[in-house]
Amino acid sequence: MPEKKNTGPSYETIMRDLEARRFSPIYILMGEESYYIDKISDYIATHVLKPEERDFNQNIVFGADVTASQIVDSAKAYPMMAEKRVVIVKESQNLKGTEALEKYFKNPVASTILVLCHKNGSIDKRKKIIPSAQAGGGVIFESKKLYERELPGFIETYLRQHQVTIEPKAAQMIADHVGADLNRLTSELDKLLLSHLTTNGRVTPEVVEKEIGVSKDFNAFELRNAIIYRDIYKANLIIKYFDNNPKAGSLFSFLPMIFTYFENLMIAYYAPNRNNEN
């Protein structure tokens, strides 16, 4: 997956550390993109402790249902017949007051892994909870939404991790149809992986059209090509198709791809040395 735009460690770095069982006592996972927050917290919930250890050593609560003091009390408890204790606070943005947590962060219990999942935005870094967590050896992860232009790369990387490749046009078709909701996007990609419709481990536009319901003839790729080759009739045909079928997608989602093409065209046109090598 592409490196995320974070102020701290990337998703990939955090996952490598978790897989190597290099745990931090505090994780503050925050941001607009819930996908990476869920992936990290779910991994901690399912991999740190053995199934038989979780009943007495793992607590998963919601921010609206607990106080900061109750979270601290749970975090201060020592593990029973296990190496670690895990406390995960989902939707911690609903937590009222963090003073008790700030105090706990000054001297966190080494055997406890405390995870705060703050969704739908990031914590103001000027608030004491962030520097307090950092001083206590905590990991601060900020998960931001991917730009539209980054979605095809995300799709290619996700499928490659499952030993499947995808044609650029097919990746763009999916990105335009689904958008930047990574939970929904990965759900659609999982459908592709389960469909067994790939040809020699490769996803084609025909597969996307059949499995996801995206037209291989009416999409951003075809609109861009129609503009490039000055095929006014085809360009208007595609525009009219989406105007008459709003559920098929929005023309506005095509703009990043078209803009990028003309941006690159201008860069090439005004380059000082326009030759094949440059």
Tell where the protein language model's regions lie, with residue ranges.
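Conserved beta/loop motifs at nucleotide-recognition and modification sites
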Residues: M1-N278
